């Protein structure tokens, strides 16, 4: 049985490869910004939005590929005041996001949804709490300049498995959720369905 990751995230693909899974990747091309805005307007939480985005990606690809299992994944970031940060569109916006997060805690929700024949068949959501240390403007400017090509694709402007680890004082949660997918529940499910080695 074929497994597809409906994501262009290098971090998510690397996690699946490191776990020894055979899979293909394809982009779902879901309008994440529009869907997020609609869900926020409807009063949905960042946790539920991550789940809905992951489901939209998985279902979109699975509806075109009968019998294929598709994994959609997405992450959302919420500050303690309830506001959400999206992927930065410019280096200046990335710097602004980092200034807003500096010296504060935020919560990261990473969801994975499996779909087959156009319908969701499994889901899991992981949560991590992360504390970014106080950051100087000079550090932020240098960090963004050196890492823009990779952080532009992340909701928190960091890849914790790389230079982003320099941002943090404290982290609660598993590393896979922070990178972008609740791997342990996903692997348990994939083994139960025969899509991962027992």
Swiss-Prot record:
Q: Name one GO biological process term.
A: nucleotide metabolic process
The UniProt GO MF terms for this protein read:
nucleoside triphosphate diphosphatase activity
Cofactor names from the entry are: a divalent metal cation
Check the record and name the Pfam families matching this protein.
Answer: Maf (PF02545)
Q: Which reaction does it catalyse?
A: a ribonucleoside 5'-triphosphate + H2O = a ribonucleoside 5'-phosphate + diphosphate + H(+); a 2'-deoxyribonucleoside 5'-triphosphate + H2O = a 2'-deoxyribonucleoside 5'-phosphate + diphosphate + H(+)
Q: Which GO terms describe its cellular component?
A: cytoplasm
Q: What subcellular compartments does it reside in?
A: Cytoplasm
Q: Which UniProt keywords apply?
A: Cytoplasm, Hydrolase, Nucleotide metabolism
For this protein, the Enzyme Commission number is 3.6.1.9
Record-annotated disulphide pairs: none
Chief subcellular location = cytoplasm
EC top class, in one word? hydrolase
Segments crossing the lipid bilayer: none
Establish whether keyword Hydrolase is in the entry: yes
Question: Where are the catalytic residues?
Answer: 74 (proton acceptor)
**Highest taxon of source:** Bacteria
Keyword Oxidoreductase set for record: no
What is stated as this protein's family in its record? Belongs to the Maf family.
Q: Give the function comment from the record.
A: Nucleoside triphosphate pyrophosphatase. May have a dual role in cell division arrest and in preventing the incorporation of modified nucleotides into cellular nucleic acids.
Q: What is the recorded name of this protein?
A: Nucleoside triphosphate pyrophosphatase
Q: What is the lineage of its organism?
A: Bacteria, Pseudomonadati, Pseudomonadota, Alphaproteobacteria, Sphingomonadales
């Amino acid at each position: 049985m074929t497994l597809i990751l409906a994501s262009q995230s290098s971090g998510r693909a690397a996690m699946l490869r490191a776990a020894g899974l055979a899979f293909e990747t394809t982009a779902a091309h879901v309008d994440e910004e529009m869907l997020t805005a609609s869900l926020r307007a409807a009063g949905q939480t960042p946790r539920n939005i991550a789940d809905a985005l992951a489901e939209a990606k998985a279902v979109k690809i699975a509806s075109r590929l009968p019998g294929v299992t598709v994994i959609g994944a997405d992450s959302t970031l919420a500050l303690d005041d309830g506001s959400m940060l999206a992927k930065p569109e410019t280096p200046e916006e990335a710097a602004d996001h980092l200034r807003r997060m500096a010296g504060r805690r935020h919560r990261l929700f990473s969801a994975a949804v499996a779909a087959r024949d156009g319908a969701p068949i499994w889901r899991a959501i992981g949560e991590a709490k992360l504390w970014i240390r106080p950051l100087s403007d000079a550090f932020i400017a240098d960090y963004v300049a050196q890492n823009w090509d990779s952080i532009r694709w992340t909701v928190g402007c960091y890849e914790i498995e790389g230079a982003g680890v320099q941002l943090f004082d404290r982290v609660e949660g598993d590393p896979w959720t922070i990178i972008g997918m609740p791997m342990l529940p996903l692997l348990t499910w994939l083994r139960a369905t025969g899509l991962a080695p027992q």
